[in-house]
Amino acid sequence: MATTMEQEICAHSMTFEECPKCSALQYRNGFYLLKYDEEWYPEELLTDGEDDVFDPDLDIEVVFETQGNSTSSDKNNSSSEGNEGVIINNFYSNQYQNSIDLSANATGSDPPKTYGQFSNLLSGAVNAFSNMLPLLADQNTEEMENLSDRVSQDTAGNTVTNTQSTVGRLVGYGTVHDGEHPASCADTASEKILAVERYYTFKVNDWTSTQKPFEYIRIPLPHVLSGEDGGVFGAALRRHYLVKTGWRVQVQCNASQFHAGSLLVFMAPEYPTLDVFAMDNKWSKDNLPNGTRTQANRKGPFAMDHQNFWQWTLYPHQFLNLRTNTTVDLEVPYVNIAPTSSWTQHASWTLVIAVVAPLTYSTGASTSLDITASIQPVRPVFNGLRHEVLSRQSPIPVTIREHAGTWYSTLPDSTVPIYGKTPVAPANYMVGEYKDFLEIAQIPTFIGNKVPNAVPYIEASNTAVKTQPLAVYQVTLSCSCLANTFLAALSRNFAQYRGSLVYTFVFTGTAMMKGKFLIAYTPPGAGKPTSRDQAMQATYAIWDLGLNSSYSFTVPFISPTHFRMVGTDLVNITNADGWVTVWQLTPLTYPPGCPTSAKILTMVSAGKDFSLKMPISPAPWSPQGVENAEKGVTENTDATADFVAQPVYLPENQTKVAFFYDRSSPIGAFTVKSGSLESGFAPFSNQACPNSVILTPGPQFDPAYDQLRPQRLTEIWGNGNEETSEVFPLKTKQDYSFCLFSPFVYYKCDLEVTLSPHTSGNHGLLVRWCPTGTPNKPTTQVLHEVSSLSEGRTPQVYSAGPGTSNQISFVVPYNSPLSVLPAVWYNGHKRFDNTGYLGIAPNSDFGTLFFAGTKPDIKFTVYLRYKNMRVFCPRPTVFFPWPTSGDKIDMTPRAGVLMLE
């Protein structure tokens, strides 16, 4: 009897149903969309019917259920929005009044190609976050002969890279660069030059045992290829004003099977580098990862070029673990604040190679390993001219506010726009957008061991002590060891959480080492386990070292309450949830010539069912020793719950980006000059309260010089110039909550502005808004007895007398010529001569406000609220000071830090 098509054998010696190529839903540019999980995989991985990649484990998968109300037809001028949970009456019969995204009108009809669901963040052929999946050509070769047999070959132009120990290529943000022309350029582009798209290989540096954890080397792109070593690409780069390109990178480090250690290799957008955009010639490490200082005698909480290396895994990355692989492959698309880049002023991508587990070896082995890098520009497009489109303006309809007389920082609606229907620069070229913080909370970041002298690993040896665990972690988000994980950084902005936690361990010993470990979770109530036998009475797993060097241990959510507190003042049943302990089950075994110990990287992430609720202000940043350490033991807690892990999904969550930032935050206090309602505007300041402000969440106004005019800064400054633990209150003006937690490189939104006077009374207040780049300064008075802020077509708002409300509120549309704005740091200069501040992009704000009034004693607070917020490309948050032994970070009453003794 004839067989069906599913039972027939295809050209790949498999049935059509089992063959990933023949059953693929789609093929495009060397990638297959596989049927079984609807994820994209590169063709080079689908070469052998016995490969594990045909049926890989999906270790990290974001499952989002429908949240809030679904969209419906617009009847009677109303819209239903699930995040805010209310019905908003739309008085203007227009669903988007503040700014109009022109992305659909930009050059090119095809949308950006993404590869999978979670792949739109940090994905690719291999899940590199919690499982280094071997791409075995012959499994027996590795298991029986201890030889790597994971072959990968890539051809670019007349160059070929080949490796026999690959872990696959990671495609950053799940998107490859398409080579489309930028919509901002009208000239004919230079592209598709075969001699340009090739690998350029060079030595990076030597790796020795002297390098400590988190020492790094930075390689800014494209500048490392802009010289003679860049060949034809460098020549084309030097002859063009603008370039738009993706990057493909392979980093190699050949070591023997008797070497141990691990490197973290990642590609980071807008990563701080040297002013000259040159590759580091030696290994470096920031002593305090809270940003660099431009002047040694000025102190403050942190600078805007901060980098928290405990969260570097938020960037597209792979581990070069000498036990598993000797090469890593990364590919990233083009990202920038504009559709193309002025490369002489800006390095949008930086390749960073960092040590996470130091190099170890035995006597007689090679003491130094060479690190080399092969870099290929992917489909570069060169342009020389720029084309800009003028913006249109339209009048604003006026209506009475339905909540007149009252103002709430979280009122779930939009106020009157100061400009309506304002076109904005297209951003359809951008990739790496995420809409829920849980997407990146599921990316493992490093746990600090041996706090306060923290390291990202624990150590195992050839002895197994039953009463001495390798690690003990409290199952609470306020545990001191988690202080610099992204999971804890995100959670500090919320009051309560629910769901499981995932602890990930990566063994970095030599390839010749074997051993077993026991990982246990013990609920509270009976104290933490003091021996391995006690730990085995609870939930545990045995990890056997093999080809897979990593293990993920999920801690189930077991609680007497539906939600648990993120922070803690005193340990109780609503915040602490037991311990995770790691024990050595058997001693490490190895042949002669191997090191006698090995390091295990430790990371944590959110589980699939993890959720947070009730956004709050983040905790103060500076450390204060005010309270003794907590024991971390709770009493009278029922520890007899079922340990079988069950998902605890919620139908909705409050971690969506648009919802989280849709609330007002203050940027500082301001004042007016007496009698300025009837005269020309003049810069003025009273008690560090100026009469103008740039609309941006970043810092401005230099307190050391008592500036009268607003000026963007790259650092946040406090009350004095002395370096003390107490730097508050801040003298610079900024949205401190935004600066403290903005885990993204770029953002785009409209801005709701609210002015709230400190006192009521009979006074007049005039506010003039100048869009970004407005050339005129409102200083010259043209009309007699009329303020210079009132003249012309520039939008203005006037309030006189006490009325029914003291607040002034309006929405400013996104009006920068940039397609997106840098959230924290711009790794470039404004000017062609590369002078001035490094870190502030040109016109990267929402304009400027000028104030005039009748009385000099009027003071008011300016609030910013981010409407229609979109964010792109995850990045680390601010470094959180490790608690010292016997102390904890004072975060009362919002959050606390538990210490282990």
From Swiss-Prot:
GO MF annotation: an example: zinc ion binding
GO BP term (any one): symbiont entry into host cell
Lipid attachment in record (N-myristoyl glycine): 68
Keywords for this protein: Capsid protein, Host cytoplasm, Host-virus interaction, Lipoprotein, Metal-binding, Myristate, T=pseudo3 icosahedral capsid protein, Viral attachment to host cell, Virion, Virus entry into host cell, Zinc, Zinc-finger
GO CC aspect terms: host cell cytoplasm; T=pseudo3 icosahedral viral capsid
Binding site for RNA: 22, 46-50, 69-70, 93, 95, 97, 100
Keyword Disulfide bond: no
Cysteine pairs bridged by disulfides in the record: none
Residues of the site described as Cleavage: 137-138, 393-394, 624-625
ZnF bounds (unnamed): 10-22
Family stated for the protein in its record: Belongs to the picornaviruses polyprotein family.
Protein name stated in the entry: Genome polyprotein
Species, as recorded: Mengo encephalomyocarditis virus (strain 37A)
